[in-house]
Amino acid sequence: AYGGGNIMDWIGHHNDIAHWGAGMDASGPEEVEAIGWTQSSTDVYDTPVDYEIRCVYPGGVDWVIASHLPMGTRWIGEEGWVAVDRGKLTASDERWTRLDYDPGPVVIPASTDHIDNFIQGIKSRRTCVASAETAHRSITPGHLGFASHALGRRLRFDARTERVLNDSQAHALLDKTYRKPWKR
């Protein structure tokens, strides 16, 4: 889905945080379905202006990526919710947003400068906060959403093998033949 419009632009900025917060950086959805997509009323764009991608992740975790929802990431649990959006933190329980709140043993790496973090990663050979693998896994639901929309059906996906299951037509949309001399 080259040039995938707002979906493919913003999914990398928010879904990476969603994966990170849910402990699913190296994972992906098991099911994806595109719902209610509408195209631009002009011929300037060929990507949807309104969209919803519903995903099911391992453990039955429901995941919604949609243009009608506020920007950012929200985790909803049995005791309430926590949301982040490009530096802003809100929660159903205000105590969870206080700086003196003890989150437990979780250590979150900080990066206020992705460019410097990337350069330092090259120099040190350490994984960057926003690694290529994280970016790839974060935008995968968007690519699958485009395939689901194009075919008008829900897709089942194996994140380990990165294959659409039992749907060669859908998989073909996502797995293009490489030009020579490039190989897999």
Write out the residue ranges for each language-model feature.
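NAD(P)-dinucleotide binding in Rossmann-like oxidoreductases
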Residues: 43, 55-112
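Acidic/polar loop patches that form or flank catalytic/metal-binding clefts of enzymes
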Residues: 24-34, 62-65, 82-85, 127-131, ...
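C-terminal helix-rich "cap/oligomerization" subdomain common to oxidoreductases
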Residues: 46, 120-184
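Rossmann-like dinucleotide-binding domain that binds NAD(P)(H)
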Residues: 1-58
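Residues that flank catalytic or metal-binding motifs in active/ligand-binding sites
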Residues: 28, 49-51, 69-71, 78, ...
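Tryptophan-centric aromatic hotspots in well-structured domains and transmembrane helices
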Residues: 10, 14, 20, 46, ...
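Active-site rim elements
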Residues: 1-8, 37-42, 101-108, 122-134
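A structural signal for well-ordered alpha-helical segments within the folded catalytic domains
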Residues: 5-8, 12-19, 112-116, 133-143
